[in-house]
Amino acid sequence: MKPLGNSNLRILIADDQTDVLEALRLLLKAEGFHIEQATSPAAILAAIEARDFDVVLMDLNYSRDTTSGQEGLDLLSRIQAIDSILPVVVMTAWGTVNLAVEAMRRGARDFIQKPWENERLLSVVRTQIELSQALRRGLRLEAENRLLRAEGRPALIAEAPSMEPVLQLIARVGPSDAN
């Protein structure tokens, strides 16, 4: 697979196991992504509050001998409160259908079972980035449209001095019954 060539795309990868972080870093960096890492729920939240990310890939378990995924599920709700559009893809080696459903219910955009397949992981990451970018573009356009339609804003914008005679003519003819 060829690299995307876009190092402007920033991914936060989060896991308490350094070998998992390193494997993800190598895979994603080879695809042209800028990678940041976190090893705890507190570090994840701090990173998200400090910087913008295009996607978060995060483990669900951070404490030793924990396989319930509860830490990650609780973290999902907190991430959603910070940025509800940020796509979060959760990962775990202890996945069940119930855990996947609960993660999605709390805001995860996808669920990846460890060990992962590289092609599927890359496909999920790309898809989530594209969907997030489209959603953010749509929200920006909605905001621009609201501004453009705001009351008191002229329907015609013409600032050049050469347009002054045209605007005067429109002002005279506009209120008349002429067609």
Q: Where are each of the predicted segments found?
A:
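Two-component/phosphorelay signaling modules centered on CheY-like receiver
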Residues: K2, T18-A42
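C-terminal output helix
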Residues: A42-A43, N98, I112, W116-V125, ...
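Conserved acidic segment of CheY-like receiver
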Residues: S7-V20, L24-L28, V56
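Acidic, metal-coordinating helix/loop segments flanking the phosphotransfer/catalytic sites
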Residues: L12, Q37-V55, R64-T67
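AAA+ ATPase active-site-proximal loops
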Residues: R146-N179
